[in-house]
Amino acid sequence: MQGNLLKVLGVLAIVATLVCFIFAALGMIGAVKVGDSCYMRYASDGQGGADSIIGTITLNANANYVNTAKMLSDGTTLLVPDPTRYGEWLNTQVLVENSQPVNLQVVGQVSLCLAYIPKDNLQRTGAGSNLDDNGQMIPIPRINDANNPPVSLIMDAKNNEWRNIAELYANDRVLVSVSPNFANTDATVKDAFKGAEVTQDCSENKTTYNPICGKYSVYSGEYVNACELKEKYWNCEVTWRCPTWHEQIGCDWGALGCVASCKKIPECTTKCMAWVNITRPAPENYLDDGSFTFSWSDNTGKLFIDYSALQCSYNANIPPVDKCPDRVRDRRIKDKDYIGGVHCTSGICSDGDFQKNRRFWYTADGKGGKGPTGLIYQMNDAGSVSQALPSKLEFAKFVADTDQPPDYKGKDGKYLYKVIYNIPFNSNIAKSYLQYRLWSPTSQDSSKNTGGYVLNIKQTKCYRENGNSFNDTFDDRGRVQYIIVKPSENPNTSGKTYSPQGISVDSEGKYSFNANEAGYIWMKILNDPGNNLRDYKDSEGSYKVHFSTSLKVGSFTIKVMNPLLQLFKTKVQGAATSIFKNMVCYKANDSSSCTNFFTYIKAILILYVMTYGAMFLLGFAKINQKELVIRIAKIGVVSGLMNGNTFEFFNNYLFDAITNFSDSIIANMSGYSLFTSTNTISNPFMFLDAVMSKIFFSQTFIAQLLALLSLGLSGIIYFIITFIAVCIVIITALRAVAVYIMAFMATCILIGIAPLFISFLLFDFTRYLFDNWVRFTIRYMMEPVVMMAGIIVLTQLFTIYLDFVLGYSVCWKCALPIKIPFIGTILPIALLNVPIFCINWFAPWGMDYMSGMMGVNMQNIVALVIIAYGMYGYVEFSGRIVVKLTSAVGPSATEIGGKMSHDAGQKVLSSIGMDDKTRQGITGRAEARLKQRNKTLDQAEKNRKNTQKEGGEKTNEEPPKPETPK
């Protein structure tokens, strides 16, 4: 036995080594694709017996997972998405069975389309207003795009219309900012339509500015700047008299007065003073100190001064004429004190409070206020251009400094752009437009305005997060979909039509479902497939989809042992009962097809009684009372079993009791309930279910075993030892099954021919046949019991120590770093621990290749091998025990079962040239070659000695003798 075991161990060691190097080679070339998954030691409910797999995949928004190399102008290459692979499904590498539960959580943000400058925008309106000078649409960078500045749109103050800055879909994110008020410097802005930078002088002391300077004015013409006192300025006193007789005949009647039909003649004898207006062009020159600048306000009353209503005196804007009477009669003081000052009483006066309150300019910085002065916005579902102002104006405000993007500041700490709008578009409306305009009073002619602002925009369009979806111009955009496809299919190339299932996540992005069929889960994000997949191509971002699924490990008992044993036991029991029936012709309609063995037994029994009675009467046979009782009992038993109900008695009471005796005892020893709905024992090997199910059907076990290879050179040794121990247990289990099958078959056959051997009970010279029949029946009944008693205990120990050795969760990750050896002699020591690249492989949960390898308790591995070796040896040992117990010398089920398993193993090994016959042939040929080599060396040595003697050479040293092979 020991020699056979050593041979088996040698073969298993070679196979394990080959498997080790094969998997290592696969890892080196990266041919193993299992996904970024982890096989957990226990399921989420803390129970074992299940493959609990967690994993994470990256689901790209553009549904493109293939990169191609693109040559740049500088000679370098850049990996870019393959232009022909957008909108594809991604294999999650999660293999599920039908009705298997799957839990997932979607985390991340994506933008599923790209924003472009809309029509009728701040800078242009009309047909083609959304196209640049080359006829191309102008893309808007996304908010998280730190490599590209926002798109700048120039707002001219001469435009008094609502214009669009952004087309917004449901859940869009938009970031609108305003360029600063460029003070005493040049301003440079990139014109998005021309694709070139525009630079303008924005220094102070000017009355007109380009819109990019960040300031504007609605004033034009002139305004009253001071008041001047004019003496004798106008004819203030008028008297009326009748025309004289000579001036108009018949008008003056003297004391009687004027004739009513005559017009009186005015006479101005006195001229009065008046305060006249001194005007200046509007607006005043802009000053950087804010002297003529409005502060930010959301009250239009504080944003406009009606200079036309300010007059030094009433009707001061109407000059006098040298006539009597004057054109106006009222030139009283009106706003002189406010304009010129209270204390100024002569000359030109310009010291009033008005001088300090003059305002003409609106600036993008709001003069230190809450936002850009005069900038208003609104939402418009149609995006139409109009001049109508709503009843309530929304004035733009700066967002809090904490919400200002850091990259919007320059190196000097000043804002390059300052955000004024960052509100997500959360609306039930599929689409709307964000519009802006500069406030201007309706009384002013906007065509005479000067200056303007520059608004800048970044927009993340079709924004989705954590797997949520919304309806915009495309229904359900952003919903994560999945299909379950057979392992042999690729939905991207199969040409088949599938029915995707949508995932409706909760607020945390979680979702659970049961697989509706078996296969791999494929996923992608739903987007508009139209317009040549433009939205997919414009998409950006990705989701992290965290999977967790648990599937009960397939039962070795249910899948393998039950079908095998039930089929075998049914066939054997049927054959045994058929033998019994045919021997007694039980219920046989045609007696010609069988011979009733009981007929012969009856004849023998009659002959036995007649002969023995005659001998007793003639005195040839002496018998005492004891012998008489024994002989009568034998005759009674044999004759009692020779009636028509014999088969029913054996079949109903003895047959099942004897054949299932072993199963009942084994079941009680193992502690497992083996009774089915019919209260019959179907499988005595239930104690093997846990360990054999883990070995054959558990993905987690395979991953745990392969993870040993990630522990370095020691891990390879651990793998080989553990693999050999597992193989020994498998072989032992198969040998135990073979022994059980042979014992069961022998028991059934012995019971089937029971009528024959029971008849041997009558005569002393056939008594030994009956005794041996009983011994062998008991032996084959007890042999599986004794064998299983020890294997049950050893199997439980093996299961415990196997969990000690492989009791960890496993992840597919970087496990084997490749470093340059002796790098410390060439490069700085800082590079000693930096890997060049890393091979992904199964590795224990929590193991970091940078911090050293995780150790395994060698004691547990040694114990595992000892237990496996003990199980292998116990099979034959149990057979010897039964032989001693039953004293039944002859072929045992253990020997026959061992021969069966050995022959089966040799048949498998012969395919790879590792069977005993092939190895003996190899060994024999090697020995023959070795003998021939030694013979050749001996002959060469003799020839050398003979040559020396013939040449007469002498030497004091003897030539070395050839080493005798051992």
Swiss-Prot record:
Membrane topology is:
Multi-pass membrane protein
Cellular component terms per the entry's GO annotation: plasma membrane
Which InterPro entries does the record match to this protein? Answer: Conjugal_tfr_TrbL/VirB6
- What are the protein's UniProt keywords? Cell membrane, Membrane, Signal, Transmembrane, Transmembrane helix
Compositionally biased spans, kind Basic and acidic residues: 926-966
Q: Which domain of life is it from?
A: Bacteria
Compartment list = Cell membrane
**Main localization of the protein described in the UniProt heading:** membrane
**Pfam name, any one:** TrbL
Q: Where is this region: Disordered?
A: 918-966
Give the GO biological process terms.
Answer: protein secretion by the type IV secretion system
Q: Which residues form the signal peptide?
A: 1-24
Transmembrane regions:
601-621, 711-731, 743-763, 785-805, 822-842, 855-875
The UniProt similarity line reads: Belongs to the TrbL/VirB6 family.
The name of this protein is: Uncharacterized protein RC0144
The organism encoding this protein is Rickettsia conorii (strain ATCC VR-613 / Malish 7)
